[in-house]
Amino acid sequence: MPNNIVVYDLLISCPSDVSEYVDILEKEVNHFNNFWGRTNNVIIRTRHWSKDSYSEFGSYPQKLLNKQIVDSSDMAIGVFWTRFGSPTENYGSGTEEEIERMISMNKQVFLYFLDKPISPSKIDHTQYEKIKQFMEEHKNKGIYFTIQDERTLAKKFRENLELYFDSIIRGTEFKKSSVKKE
């Protein structure tokens, strides 16, 4: 018998130093879909520039990505480690622009910062300082998590997905539009 299934698009946003984590996040989404999602008639589709964008001209690249995949996504996950990313026309990086756009549209953003060891010679300190500044700017604007490794990221992300969608199913989702601005 056919089911009515609600499909959500999840934007995966991250600089190049965490691109290997995209596969981990996609596996967690598949796990979520196969168990929690199937039971609750919810499916999440991942979107990432490397597989969901196409060649196009007429504007700067991030603006085209925003049009192609960012603005139509229902939620996003952002992951940072040691690189903040390449600047765009309006932001310090494409990842920052994507996260800020999603927040400004009152869309769900899952945000994680990796705190895993790396050789000091491999760190671009200017990039890392931008991450620390971004964390500082967002510490009183919402909840993010600092995690130590791939396994912890996978576990925490899956837990967050389940908690978030459980709040939607139960009708207790935090209503961003009802927050008073001071």
Question: What function would you assign to each model-found segment?
Answer:
Residues 1-182:
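Conserved catalytic or regulatory cores that recognize and/or transform ribose-phosphate-containing ligands
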